Amino acid sequence: MSAPATTQVEILQEGDGKTFPKPGDLVTIHYTGTLENGKKFDSSRDRGKPFQCTIGVGQVIVGWDTGIPKLSVGSRAKLSIPGHEAYGDRGFPGLIPPNATLLFDVELLNVN
C-alpha cells in the first residue's frame, strides 16, 4: 500500500527567495481555485480583494498550511491538493464534491 498523495507545489514565478511564511504568520494572497475538470469554485481575483489568513494554525485547509510556506513573497505557484488535504469526505456542498482534488493558482503578496 502506498502513502497517500500530498500537496504538490509547482512554482510558476519565483519570488524574492528570502521571505517565506512561518506558522503563525499572517499572509496576504491572491488565488483562484478550480476542480480537476477546470470548473472554478472560488477566486479572490474575481472579488478584486486579496485574501488574508494565518498560516500553519489550522485556519485554512491542510494543503494551504503545507504548500504556502514553500513560497516566498512575490511567488506565484500552482498547488495541487488531494481531497484528504482539502475538504475530505464532506466536500463543500454545492461547490466541491467529496474527496475532490483541488487546484489553486496562488500568488503570495505579503507576509506579516
Swiss-Prot record:
State the organism named in the record: Debaryomyces hansenii (strain ATCC 36239 / CBS 767 / BCRC 21394 / JCM 1990 / NBRC 0083 / IGC 2968) (Yeast)
Q: Which reaction does it catalyse?
A: [protein]-peptidylproline (omega=180) = [protein]-peptidylproline (omega=0)
User: Which domain of life, per UniProt?
Assistant: Eukaryota
Q: How is its activity regulated?
A: Inhibited by both FK506 and rapamycin.
Compartments, record wording: Cytoplasm
Which residue intervals define the domain PPIase FKBP-type in the entry?
24-112
Q: Which EC class is the enzyme in?
A: isomerase
The protein depicted here goes by the name FK506-binding protein 1
Which terms does the record give in the GO molecular function aspect? peptidyl-prolyl cis-trans isomerase activity
State any GO CC term. cytoplasm
Family membership noted in the UniProt record: Belongs to the FKBP-type PPIase family. FKBP1 subfamily.
Protein function: PPIases accelerate the folding of proteins. It catalyzes the cis-trans isomerization of proline imidic peptide bonds in oligopeptides.
EC number of this enzyme: 5.2.1.8
Q: Which InterPro entries match?
A: FKBP-type_PPIase, PPIase_dom_sf, PPIase_FKBP_dom
Ranges for the region named Disordered are 1-20
What are the Polar residues biased-composition ranges? 1-10
